[in-house]
């Protein structure tokens, strides 16, 4: 690994530009290539394999870091923190999980960047508790306008984020009570036209690509796990689960299944309950 491409070697904007050009030159891995390297690292502790996994994903870290550019924090630092998350993810990645490294690593990358933002962006110091941090990192996704939430929107946001409505109001107030020098230019201040600072938005719209990629990988992984879990059930249990839960257009009633199998509806309910329990256990094993 050259000094130019080493994840921690970021100091100035010029070196960052050079770094980005360098990491974009590393080829992306196919699924088979990635698995081979992951197995070498996981089972044999192969450091060269770890380097291969890291280098091939450095461009993804840059992509994620750009989503946090609105804070005015040095992009080099954001990338550097993201790289720390990537290295932690590579160290913990198990090739038997059945997902691509990018899906696993994105959580670690974002976690490191989030912590960096919370440590260094002065306005974010308003978010100190776990609930407040959760609100801070999700509130902008729920806002449909720049003004205050109405009561209905507060209830919706609170329900979606699993917090109390009062906490939503408190965080909204804290976000509104910004540092004026950071929030407004002198001209805007003189004209009485304060604007909402872009730092209120953790990630810009360009980060959706990473989110979509992550979602697609996890959806495929979940579908595979569900199929394998269903296959572990007996034929009758499979049919009951499919008829009751997997056929959205024609969901079968307990009574219909009872007549089909010549048993009571209560017996079908018991079979369904047992099948769902086994299915949950089986999904957890794969």
UniProtKB/Swiss-Prot annotation:
Residue numbers covered by motif Interaction with polymerase core subunit RpoC: 77-80
Chain residue ranges for the region called Sigma-70 factor domain-2: 53-122
GO molecular function: DNA binding; sigma factor activity
Gene3D superfamilies: 1.20.120.1810, Winged helix-like DNA-binding domain superfamily/Winged helix DNA-binding domain (1.10.10.10)
Region (Sigma-70 factor domain-4): 229-281
Keyword Oxidoreductase: no
GO biological process, one term: DNA-templated transcription initiation
Family to which this protein belongs: Belongs to the sigma-70 factor family. RpoH subfamily.
NCBIfam families reported for this sequence: PRK06596.1, rpoH_proteo, sigma70-ECF
Protein name (Swiss-Prot/TrEMBL): RNA polymerase sigma factor RpoH
Organism annotation: Vibrio cholerae serotype O1 (strain ATCC 39315 / El Tor Inaba N16961)
């Amino acid at each position: 690994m050259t000094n130019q491409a080493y994840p921690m070697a970021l100091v100035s904007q010029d070196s960052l530009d050079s770094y980005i050009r360098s990491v974009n030159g590393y080829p992306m891995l196919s699924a088979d290539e990635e698995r081979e390297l992951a197995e070498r690292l996981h089972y044999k502790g192969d450091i060269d394999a770890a380097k291969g996994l890291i280098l091939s994903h450095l461009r993804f870290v840059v992509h994620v870091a750009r989503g946090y550019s609105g804070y005015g924090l040095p992009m080099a630092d954001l990338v550097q923190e993201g790289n720390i998350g990537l290295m932690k993810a590579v160290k913990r990645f198990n090739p038997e999980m059945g997902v691509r490294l990018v899906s696993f690593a994105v959580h670690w990358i974002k976690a490191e960047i989030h912590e960096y933002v919370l440590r260094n962006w002065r306005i974010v110091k308003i978010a100190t508790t776990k609930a407040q941090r959760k609100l801070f990192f999700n509130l902008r996704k729920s806002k449909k306008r720049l003004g205050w939430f109405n009561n209905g929107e507060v209830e919706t946001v609170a329900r979606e984020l699993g917090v109390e409505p009062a906490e939503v109001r408190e965080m909204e107030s804290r976000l509104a009570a910004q540092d004026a020098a950071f929030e407004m230019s002198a001209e805007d201040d003189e004209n009485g036209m304060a604007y909402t600072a872009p730092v209120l938005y953790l990630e810009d719209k360009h980060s959706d690509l990473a989110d979509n990629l992550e979602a697609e990988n996890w959806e495929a992984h979940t579908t595979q796990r569900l199929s394998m879990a269903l296959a572990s059930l007996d034929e009758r249990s499979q049919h009951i689960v499919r008829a009751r839960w997997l056929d959205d257009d024609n969901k079968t009633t307990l009574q219909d299944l009872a007549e089909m199998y010549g048993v009571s509806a209560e017996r079908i309910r018991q079979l369904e309950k047992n099948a769902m329990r086994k299915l949950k256990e089986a999904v957890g094993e794969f």
